[in-house]
Amino acid sequence: MTTTPPSVFGNVRLGYIVIETNKFADWRRFGQDAIGMHYDDTLPDVTRFRLDDNECRFLLQRGPAEDVTALGWRLDDHDTFDEILSRVTRHGVPVTEGTAEEAALRGVERLVRFPGPNGLAQEIFTRAHTSSTAPSRRHRAGDDARDASNLKCYCRTY
C-alpha cells in the first residue's frame, strides 16, 4: 500500500533571491531609484533591498557571476519544512545547513540549502526576521521616473 505524501501546495512562497554581482551602483539605481525598494548597504560586499517589513528580499553579494545564485523559499510551518527536507533527501539530493552568518544576511532564523535541477541553489526557511524600521519612502517607485527620459539611467539596452 502506497501512502500519498502530505501536500505542501499553498505552503511555499518565494522569500528572497540572492544575486552575485560587481555592479552595485547599477543595482542601487535600479532597486532604490527606479523600483523604490529600501536599500541597506551596511556591509562592504553585501547590499540588501526590501519592499516590506522583511529584512531582506534581494541579497546582492560581490562576485563575478552577474546572475541569480540562490532562491529562498519561505515555508509556512515546520511540518512543511520537514516534508520538503524529507522528499529532497529521500531522492539523494545533497542538503547543507546554512551558517548563522548566511541566515543573518538573508534575514531568516535558519536555512537549509540544496541544488535545484539546473544547479541553482534552493534555500528553504520558515521564519523571516522583520525590520524594526519602516522601508524608506524617500525613493518610491516612479518619483524619478515620471519623465521617461530619466529611465535611461536605470535600464540599459543590450
How would you label these PLM feature ranges?
Residues 36-69, 77, 120-128:
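Conserved short beta-strand elements that form part of the metal-binding/catalytic scaffold
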Residues 2-7, 13-22, 63-151, ...:
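Vicinal oxygen chelate
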Residues 38, 70-72, 133-136:
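A short, polar/proline- and glycine-enriched secondary-structure boundary/capping micro-motif
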Residues 52-54, 74-75, 106, 143-145:
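Non-heme Fe(II)-dependent double-stranded beta-helix
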